[in-house]
Amino acid sequence: MGKYVLRRLLMTILVVLVASVVVFTLVYFVPGDPVKILMSPESTVAELEAKRHSLGLDRPYLVQLGNFLYNAYIKFDLGTSWIRGTSVVEGLAERLPYTFQLGVLAILVSSLIGIPLGINAAVHQNCWQDRVCMLIGMVCTSVPDFWIALLMIVLFSQKLNWLPAFGVGGITYLIMPVIAASLKSIGTLARQTRSSMLEVIRSDYVTTARAKGLKERSVIYKHMLPNALIPIITVIGGSFSGIIAGTVVIEQVFSRPGVGTYLTQAITNRDFPIIRGCVIILAIFTSVMMLLVDLAYAVVDPRIKAQYAGQSRKRSHKHGGNPHHRHHHHHDHGGHDHHDHCEESEKGERKDG
């Protein structure tokens, strides 16, 4: 498994390097002269040329790219803001905690709401509970986060005066941003959890667990959910990365001093060092999240851990009976109509009670 982690780390470094080259190239070839934005309109040609030389913008593309990569990955220096005159690394260090605070809380809320919604929908497939849960998920996915953010500001801050609208502080400053940032992930997790649970709900080991007289809650959370976790973990990892990237909008709406606001202001001012630094940080974060997701697979599925350890597939299958072999079991049991499943769910609930 150590070799796999090392291989993935090397791949992560390669991805980040490619992302760095791409963002540098895009910024380099953006039309317009950033020096004219930095200098006053009355500046002479000589002053503009002097400023361009001091920033290194008069050097060839490959020279600038090489200097940027060397400074970023050898000296860990992302440069100095052209507008603020401060270190980009220091600016990111000040703002990253606010962004991660928002992202972590949002993915926790998404998981605590979205996964139970999906489970409830799956165990009551085609019943009214299923329809209600999926309707909630569809609404969460469909509503734009910036629109719900503005709506909450108007309602809870301006009209009712319950919550502060802008800035940072105590927990009350986080309630509306976290809700706005987590809505899409709630819907996505609910749908994925339902789909994953339906893949295992009619598996042989689930039928056996019920035949042993286990309570329905035990069957769901000890036998179904663990075997449905792989796709759910994938969605959680992707949602977390999406939430962090989506803070560009949320932080602007709620005036939070995070990376999103930092990046937006840099784009407005054409402050290229900040733009490049923010994109690199987001690329590193996304790549690390994907690595953590892959490692989480090994925690919930012993077969994957065995593969990471270099064991052959034949040896992995030799110890059969693993309930994780659960793909598409439900397709082999087509004799159950919708009403029967609703009745089964109701019986299971009565038994659980």
Cite the ranges covered by each PLM segment:
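Membrane-water interface segments at the C-terminal ends of transmembrane alpha-helices
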Residues: 22-23, 27-29, 68, 72, ...
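Residue-level signal for discrete positions within transmembrane alpha-helices
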Residues: 12, 95, 99, 135-142, ...
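N-terminal signal-anchor/signal peptide hydrophobic helix marking the start
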Residues: 6-16
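Alpha-helical transmembrane segments of integral membrane proteins
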Residues: 2-3, 94-129, 168-314
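An internal, D/E-rich "acidic patch" concept
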Residues: 58-115
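Hydrophobic alpha-helical segments of integral membrane proteins
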Residues: 9, 51, 55-73, 77, ...
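Hydrophobic alpha-helical transmembrane segments of membrane transport/permease proteins
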Residues: 15-66, 160-176
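Histidine-centered metal-binding segments
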Residues: 313-353
